[in-house]
Amino acid sequence: MRVRILNRRANAYILKHPLAFTLSVLKGFRANQGLLLAGAVAYYALLSIVPFLMLVVVALSHFIDPAELLVTLRRYLELLMPGQSASITAEVANFLDNRELITWVLGGTMLFFSSFAFTVLENAMSVIFVHRVAIRRRHFLVSALLPYCYMLALGIGVMLVTVVAGTLQVMGKESVILLGTTWSLGGVSGALLYLLGLAGEILVLTSIYLVMPVGRLSTSHALVGGVTAALLWEAARHVLVWYFSTLSQVNVVYGSMTTAIVVMFSLEIGATLLLFGAQVIAEYERVGRGKPERHPPMTTAPA
């Protein structure tokens, strides 16, 4: 009941003052050094994503055909890193071919590096939702174990997506006869594969908004944030694809570093949209509670 009252109050304010709410979100994002936080998240995501994918593929290859795993990985990495999924998948495939060389020390080191992005993301969320941290802090053991639990959940998600995607691909090879005309299901299969990826994006973003901030966030708030961030990213992704395929000369400027630069740039934009969505949710909570607008700049304690 209390959440509904807060939601009604926030919705009424936003409908009455949409521009003021938008400006307040932008001010809060700037005061919290949102772009700086996004840069940190993107940098550690770049360090984490390759070892994480390698570990996931090696683990799941015991249950699912590795070739099918790599095809699914390449398709849905394209949603995260436009134009660069092939090179990342090639590195993962090369690691998979040499998986017998993996030792416990190497596996543990890769697992440790894979957790960096989630740890930094949790810290960034604590800056955005500073009003929650001031009330309740998360136990350090929970913070330490959270990245690994989240990686396990993502690994299970990759397995489920691979199974469903494989089923849809098989369906795409079939056809139906309707009113004497044969209709191929290839187009339907392609559309469903894209929607599966979009639904996965929304689910992952929603889970981040639910899990990473301290305290319990309303599911409806997290879902709205997840849908908004996913749709904004889809728009940004199409712009990136168009830019890199028509206007960009990044390969001329950076040469062999092109892949890393493009991936970093894509992750930077994605992290910015992710944290901006979190700022929208934080501002929505503030408006719902009827608190005055306060966005003091983020500062650090003196040495």
Language-model segments: which ranges?
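Membrane-embedded alpha-helices and immediately adjacent juxtamembrane helical segments
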Residues: 1-303
